[in-house]
């Protein structure tokens, strides 16, 4: 027999608005051939989606369990000079790869669902794996690693089983002795339900138009409602 478990998801709102003058719209159309409303709508929708993505990433950082807790000089920190036991840089980077493997194995041991298969890391960590000769770039990034400063970047596949993503804002996290360099290993199964965190949209992104009652100038806004919820069977710092 089996049972169906359920959990409550509270939908919250996220919205952005913008105002512009009719004179601006007229000049922009006459000089540059651009539609002011369309340009602002594109900016607002892109910003909202970017904020949602960052919220998901921050949530992952917050609830992720500490890795590198065994056979390291300092729990939670993998020191390339001490813990890797390598003689030169490439050997040290391969030691880092072994530690990532251990953390991926820990996910399989804890969840019994599967081994970790997603890595989100800082740019220097991805570069270290590249120098070790274990990161195969996608065709678009065959020449060099092009890190996008506006969002998480898919860097390539590690050993044919780990999808590696670079967080371009990683410099703002944990700027202590490790210089803000880190990685997070996660698991995502083949089924949509086989994950640890779910994005649950309630109301899709909607556009609203209005006119100011005093200025008679146009206003536009975008609003969406959604929730983030952990897998009821997942284990993290907040579970």
Where are these predicted regions, by residue range?
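Sequence/fold signature of self-assembling virion shell proteins
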Residues: 4-23, 27-29, 34-38, 42, ...
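Extended, solvent-exposed, turn-rich assembly/linker loops in the middle of proteins
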Residues: 71-145
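Alpha-helical scaffold segments that mediate packing/assembly in large oligomeric complexes
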Residues: 22, 33-35, 39-102
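Intrinsically disordered or highly flexible coil/loop and linker segments, enriched in small
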Residues: 27-30, 49-70, 102, 106-117, ...
